[in-house]
C-alpha cells in the first residue's frame, strides 16, 4: 500500500492506494461529480483507493482536481515502478448508454497524453475542461502514455464516466501479471 500526503496553499491531500485490491473506495474531495468518477476508477480498476482533499473549492474546482491527479499519479508510480512482469500495454472501451470512450495505455515510463474528449460545457457545477487537467496530472506523474479518445455520445456525464471507466479497465489489463521480466526490448523502463 502506498500513502502520500501533499499540502500546498491551495489543497491538502491524502491518498492511500493498494493496486492489487478489490475496488473499494473512500473518496471525499468536496466535488461530488469528481468523487463519483474516482469511485468508478477504483471499482473498475480493482484498486483500493482512499482520497481526502481539502481544497480551495470556494475559488473553483481546478486546484482540487489537478492536485488529486498529481498525488494519485505519484501513488500509482510508487505502486508500479520498477516495471516488470506486467502486460504493459492495454486498451478498453467501457460504454455507458450512448457514450463510448476508448483508452489506450502504455505503462512504459514515457509520459504522454492524447486527449480527445469534449472540453466545453458543465456537468452540474463541474467544468468539462477539468477532466483533461486531471488526466494530464495523473499521466505525467504516473509516467505513462495514455490516449483518451472520444468515439460517440451526447450526454456529458456519460462521456466522462465512460472515460474514467475505460481508463480503469485498461489500467487493470495493463497491470495484469505476465511472466515476462521487464516488458521492454531495452531491458529497462
Curated annotation (Swiss-Prot):
Any one GO MF annotation of this record: imidazoleglycerol-phosphate dehydratase activity
Metabolic or biological pathway: Amino-acid biosynthesis; L-histidine biosynthesis; L-histidine from 5-phospho-alpha-D-ribose 1-diphosphate: step 6/9
CDD domains in the cross-refs: IGPD (cd07914)
Entry's Gene Ontology BP terms: L-histidine biosynthetic process
SUPFAM superfamilies: Ribosomal protein S5 domain 2-like
Domain of life, source organism: Bacteria
One CC-aspect GO term: cytoplasm
Keyword terms: Amino-acid biosynthesis, Cytoplasm, Histidine biosynthesis, Lyase
Protein localization: Cytoplasm
Transmembrane segment boundaries: none
Enzyme Commission code(s) on record: 4.2.1.19
Reaction catalysis annotation: D-erythro-1-(imidazol-4-yl)glycerol 3-phosphate = 3-(imidazol-4-yl)-2-oxopropyl phosphate + H2O
Similarity section: Belongs to the imidazoleglycerol-phosphate dehydratase family.
Matches recorded under NCBIfam families: PRK00951.2-1, PRK00951.2-4
PANTHER family linked: IMIDAZOLEGLYCEROL-PHOSPHATE DEHYDRATASE, IMIDAZOLEGLYCEROL-PHOSPHATE DEHYDRATASE HIS7
Protein name: Imidazoleglycerol-phosphate dehydratase
Organism lineage string: Bacteria, Pseudomonadati, Campylobacterota, Epsilonproteobacteria, Nautiliales
Amino acid at each position: 500500500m502506498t500513502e502520500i500526503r501533499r499540502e500546498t496553499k491551495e489543497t491538502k491531500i491524502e491518498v492511500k492506494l493498494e493496486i492489487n485490491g478489490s475496488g473499494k473506495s473512500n473518496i471525499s474531495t468536496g466535488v461530488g461529480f469528481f468523487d463519483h468518477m474516482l469511485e468508478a476508477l477504483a471499482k473498475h480498476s480493482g484498486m483500493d483507493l482512499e482520497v481526502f482533499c481539502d481544497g480551495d473549492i470556494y475559488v473553483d474546482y481546478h486546484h482540487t482536481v489537478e492536485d488529486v491527479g498529481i498525488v494519485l499519479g505519484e501513488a500509482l508510480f510508487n505502486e508500479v515502478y520498477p516495471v516488470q512482469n506486467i502486460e504493459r500495454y492495454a486498451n478498453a472501451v467501457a460504454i455507458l448508454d450512448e457514450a463510448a470512450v476508448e483508452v489506450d495505455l502504455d505503462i512504459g515510463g514515457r509520459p504522454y497524453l492524447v486527449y480527445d474528449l469534449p472540453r466545453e460545457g458543465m456537468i452540474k457545477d463541474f467544468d468539462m475542461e477539468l477532466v483533461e487537467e486531471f488526466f494530464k496530472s495523473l499521466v505525467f506523474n504516473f509516467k505513462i502514455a495514455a490516449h483518451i479518445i472520444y468515439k460517440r455520445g451526447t450526454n456529458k456525464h456519460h462521456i466522462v464516466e465512460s472515460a474514467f471507466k475505460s481508463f480503469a479497465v485498461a489500467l487493470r489489463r495493463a497491470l495484469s501479471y505476465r511472466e515476462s521480466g521487464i516488458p521492454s526490448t531495452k531491458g529497462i523502463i
